[in-house]
Amino acid sequence: MFGYHGKILVVDLTSETSHWIDIEKEHLRQYIGGVGLGAYLLFKFSVPGSDPFDPSSPLIFATSPLVGTRLTTSSKFAVVSKSPLTGFINDSLSSSFCATELKKCGCDALILIGRAKRPTLLFVQNGRVDFLDAKYLTGLTTAETEKTVKETLNDYVVRVLAIGPAGENLVHYATISNDGGRHAGRGGAGAVMGS
């Protein structure tokens, strides 16, 4: 189906493993766009009644079929989770090259489940996921984190999705920063990422 890979990357932070799953074309047609796809995946992967900070509550980064095209405003991705502010579904959009890079990895969505045992930097490249120690990033602002990751990897075009002290401390309205100051800024997705 044009605009989709039909693939979802699922990363289990607890076991530090990842795997790919296929998504049926009918679901891609029915739940179009990053928010629609993310909402479908949230309901599919969530445990009913779970707390937003529970390891069983997924954090989903989803793209639309237009990501990677030359269409204006097509570089948006949706971050979908349960909101720590409301306890209900939350979607937050951000526009950046992170959306394009996610699509270039060959997936339509990235699902994070579980809880990391230590501060962890996920490095996703060419369909491979590496779990790197990120203790050295703890306490840094999002701008400092992005700069430090790029310097550490010696890759100044790598895209970074980061939380700062607010997300680390589970502030219920924390954001996820990316691409030098763009944010997925609604509903506390940064706190979910920090949990």
What does each of the following model-derived ranges do?
Residues 99-100, 104-195:
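Active-site cavity-forming subdomains of large catalytic enzyme subunits
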Residues 95-96:
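Thiamine diphosphate
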Residues 60-62, 78, 111, 123:
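Short, conserved beta-strand segments within well-ordered enzyme catalytic domains
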Residues 3, 18, 66, 70-72, ...:
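Extended catalytic cores of very large enzyme megasubunits
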Residues 39-75:
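Conserved oxyanion/phosphate-binding beta-strand-loop segments in alpha/beta enzyme cores
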Residues 68, 75-87, 91, 167-184:
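A gly/ser-rich beta-alpha-beta helix-loop segment of oxidoreductase catalytic cores
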